UniProtKB/Swiss-Prot annotation:
<feature type="compositionally biased region" description="Low complexity">
    <location>
        <begin position="87"/>
        <end position="98"/>
    </location>
</feature>
<dbReference type="GO" id="GO:0001502">
    <property type="term" value="P:cartilage condensation"/>
</dbReference>
<keyword id="KW-0539">Nucleus</keyword>
<keyword id="KW-0963">Cytoplasm</keyword>
<dbReference type="GO" id="GO:0019901">
    <property type="term" value="F:protein kinase binding"/>
</dbReference>
<dbReference type="GO" id="GO:0005634">
    <property type="term" value="C:nucleus"/>
</dbReference>
<comment type="subunit">
    <text>Interacts with pak4/pak5.</text>
</comment>
<dbReference type="InterPro" id="IPR039201">
    <property type="entry name" value="Inka"/>
</dbReference>
<comment type="function">
    <text>Inhibitor of the serine/threonine-protein kinase pak4/pak5. Acts by binding pak4/pak5 in a substrate-like manner, inhibiting the protein kinase activity. Required for the proper migration of neural crest cells during embryonic development, probably by inhibiting pak4/pak5.</text>
</comment>
<feature type="region of interest" description="Inka box 2">
    <location>
        <begin position="281"/>
        <end position="308"/>
    </location>
</feature>
<dbReference type="InterPro" id="IPR029267">
    <property type="entry name" value="FAM212"/>
</dbReference>
<dbReference type="GO" id="GO:0030291">
    <property type="term" value="F:protein serine/threonine kinase inhibitor activity"/>
</dbReference>
<dbReference type="GO" id="GO:0005737">
    <property type="term" value="C:cytoplasm"/>
</dbReference>
<dbReference type="Pfam" id="PF15342">
    <property type="entry name" value="FAM212"/>
</dbReference>
<feature type="region of interest" description="Inka box 1">
    <location>
        <begin position="164"/>
        <end position="201"/>
    </location>
</feature>
<protein>
    <recommendedName>
        <fullName>PAK4-inhibitor inka1</fullName>
    </recommendedName>
</protein>
<comment type="similarity">
    <text>Belongs to the INKA family.</text>
</comment>
Amino acid sequence: MLCLQESGDCLRDQMRYMMRSLQDLKHLRRSCVAPPVGPPVRLRACKQLIAQRERRARLRISDASEASSYDSACCLSSSLEEEESASDPSAVSSPSSERSLEFDSGYSEASWQDEGVVLRRTKNIRVSSTACLRTNQLSNTRARPKSTSDACLESWTSFETASDPEDWTTSLLTRGRNRQPLVLGDNSFADLIHNWMDLPECPEQTELKHSSGRSFAKDFLVNIKRRIAGFSRSADGRRKSSDVTKLSKSIVPTKRLSCQIDVQHKMPFFYKSHTGLNELDTDYYQFSALMKSGSRTPIVCNDIIGYI
């Protein structure tokens, strides 16, 4: 029991020494820390950051609100330029033409004379969150450039005389860049050709009707004559073909019988066989020739016993 009490007292003393050492360390840390920065310096830094964020938010809101009244244009911004604008607050108020590239399919051909576009090549190029939106900082000061197509249309319309204001061809030329739908009539293609080309005068309807009736009657008579001639030729051809077939049927067996007959050569008496005896009549050779020719004519045997 005494040993346990002594050990407990030792542990208590060690805990007290540890607490005192921790308190001493706290006092040393407070004494070694540098004097705190003045509050006005911190307030200035915070105000600058807040002002920069407010300016960026205002620019984004203005771009989004004015996008409906301007054509779409893709603005490419780089991360390096954003860092420069964050470090230098004066760079935020610079015009958008110095920081971005504007792409417009209809007005890219005309170049500015008073201000040249500088193309910057950076490593990390990304499309900004308000891409395909154009700011109107420069649109209020100067007019929008015209493309070559608009200039050509103006030159074409200047030479033309004043015509009917309701003519859709003149509205097509004068309002070529307008995106309103153009409504055409049923005979729009004919009107277009009549206005743009010098067509000859059409003949009167009465003359056309008379000429068309006469030509139709002539064509009808010619077709009837051709059909009658064709029927007569076909009938004559059928008759001739039937006569030719009859003649050919009568001539075919004579042609088959007139083919050359292989006559067996004469051999000595001791080489003769019963199938090739020379004493047999010529009917035997005719019979063998008819069998080889394959004709369907009936075979008349004069001497059946001799063949056997």
